[in-house]
């Protein structure tokens, strides 16, 4: 060793022992050094451990559906399709680095979902419950309020603002969230051909939504759109945001039926009667072209590869909605009554009567709360002032004729006057 080397000894990596001249870069710390090769090795270990953690946390499609079953009644096929789509989406998100390094030629596309079905059948609840199960931020938007930039209404970027706010302004967390856009059928274009005049709340909105649904670097105003023009914009990557869009699509069943019947033509074709098929049976057979004919532009339909439908809920389904989910309406009211030390009980006939009223109003599961509120109002008004009541029984007479419930007291049973 030369005298000069003794004065300036070569620095060594504290991990692998290589000298500073044997490596590309040596980073100094407090009394230690680490080379670029060891940094790369440490990074690989961290990524591998993170993937193992993610693999443990990532729910299987079966587990996702089981969790959905706790909150959503019926819609078995829709829950199964959503579970697979969501599982694949987050597998794509969490394993992005592994996929790009091991399968560089394979690019996994987003599994955005379209839910078709009548109002009150559980579309919004499905999307909201998925976000709750996966513990990711969630935002709901109403497509009818959206317009192209520069027109009166909400810009499509405002949807991303809401997601960011719901993620407590954590950009990384927000960029892995779920956005549900309701009433998507209401922004269908008004004619089959391309729009000549400006359609700012129809085809124009579809065009504006295309990029953020597909995945883009969007500039979003953190305080919302036009009221704060001087604010700095935040760049959000939407590539890993799952978009679920839903709508009633009234009249889509006719388009599907026309296509199916149109296929049975010519010699040897089976001639069937004009018996109408059930709505659910028709919506099971929706093709992308049917949606285009309805008024969604082909590019928009192409960005949403997963199509599924939800059925109208039967009276039996609505009775189950009232009692089975973790946050069932009857359980909520029972909890309220418990706070007054009163047990609330609904007879099976009462539950059927409530479900029947919701069906009559054609509001589906959404109408159950309205029916319950109107029934329970007077009871909840009087009960806190009543002394000695330990149980309140609601039967079908209360539902159908606005009769009084049966109040059971500590010492005797009587009907409240």
From Swiss-Prot:
HAMAP family: ClpX (MF_00175). The keyword Magnesium does not apply. GO terms for cellular component: HslUV protease complex. Component of the ClpX-ClpP complex. Forms a hexameric ring that, in the presence of ATP, binds to fourteen ClpP subunits assembled into a disk-like structure with a central cavity, resembling the structure of eukaryotic proteasomes. One of its GO terms (biological process) is proteolysis involved in protein catabolic process. It holds the Pfam family zf-C4_ClpX. ATP-dependent specificity component of the Clp protease. It directs the protease to specific substrates. Can perform chaperone functions in the absence of ClpP. Belongs to the ClpX chaperone family. Keywords: ATP-binding, Chaperone, Metal-binding, Nucleotide-binding, Zinc. It comes from Lawsonia intracellularis (strain PHE/MN1-00). One of its GO terms (molecular function) is zinc ion binding. ATP binds at residues 118-125. This is ATP-dependent Clp protease ATP-binding subunit ClpX. InterPro entries: AAA+_ATPase, ATP-dep_Clp_protease_ClpX, ATPase_AAA_core, Clp_ATPase_C, Clp_protease_ATP-bd_su_ClpX, ClpX_bact, P-loop_NTPase, Znf_CppX_C4. Zn(2+) binds at residues 13, 16, 35, 38. Residues 1-54 form the ClpX-type ZB domain. CDD domains: RecA-like_ClpX.
């Amino acid at each position: 060793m030369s005298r000069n080397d003794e004065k300036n000894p070569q620095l060594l990596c504290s991990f692998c022992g290589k000298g500073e001249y044997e490596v590309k870069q040596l980073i100094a710390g407090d009394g230690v050094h680490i080379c670029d090769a060891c940094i790369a090795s440490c990074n690989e270990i961290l990524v591998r451990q993170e993937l193992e953690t993610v693999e443990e946390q990532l729910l299987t499609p079966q587990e996702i559906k089981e969790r959905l079953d706790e909150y959503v009644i019926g819609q078995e096929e829709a829950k199964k399709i959503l579970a697979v789509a969501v599982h694949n989406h987050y597998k794509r998100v969490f394993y992005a680095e592994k996929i790009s390094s091991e399968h560089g030629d394979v690019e996994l596309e987003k599994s955005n979902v379209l839910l078709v079905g009548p109002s009150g059948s559980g579309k919004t609840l499905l999307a909201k419950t998925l976000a709750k199960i996966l513990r990711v931020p969630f935002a709901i938007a109403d497509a009818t309020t959206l317009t192209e930039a520069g027109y009166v209404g909400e810009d499509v970027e405002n949807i991303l603002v809401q997601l960011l706010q719901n993620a407590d302004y954590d950009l990384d967390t927000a960029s892995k969230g779920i956005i549900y856009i309701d009433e998507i059928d209401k922004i269908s274009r008004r004619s089959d051909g391309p729009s000549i005049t400006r359609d700012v709340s129809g085809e124009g909105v579809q065009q504006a939504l295309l990029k953020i649904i597909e995945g883009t670097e969007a500039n979003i105003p953190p305080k919302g759109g036009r009221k704060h023009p001087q604010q700095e914009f935040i760049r959000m990557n939407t590539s890993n945001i799952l978009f679920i869009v839903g709508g009633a699509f009234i009249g889509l069943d006719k388009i599907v039926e026309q296509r199916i019947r149109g296929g049975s033509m010519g010699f040897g074709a089976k001639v069937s009667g004009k018996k109408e098929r059930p709505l659910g049976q028709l919506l099971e057979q929706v093709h992308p072209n049917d949606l285009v004919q309805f008024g969604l532009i082909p590019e928009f339909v192409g960005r949403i590869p997963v199509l599924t439908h939800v059925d109208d809920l039967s009276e039996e389904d609505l009775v189950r909605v009232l009692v089975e989910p973790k946050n069932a309406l009857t359980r909520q009211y029972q909890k309220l009554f418990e706070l007054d030390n009163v047990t609330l009980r609904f007879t099976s006939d009462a539950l059927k009567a409530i479900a029947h009223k919701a069906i009559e109003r054609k509001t589906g599961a959404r109408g159950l709360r309205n029916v319950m509120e109107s029934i329970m109002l007077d009871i909840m008004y009087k009960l806190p002032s009543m002394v000695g009541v330990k149980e309140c029984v609601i039967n079908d007479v209360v539902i159908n004729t606005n009769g009084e419930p049966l109040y059971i007291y500590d010492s005797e049973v009587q009907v409240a006057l």
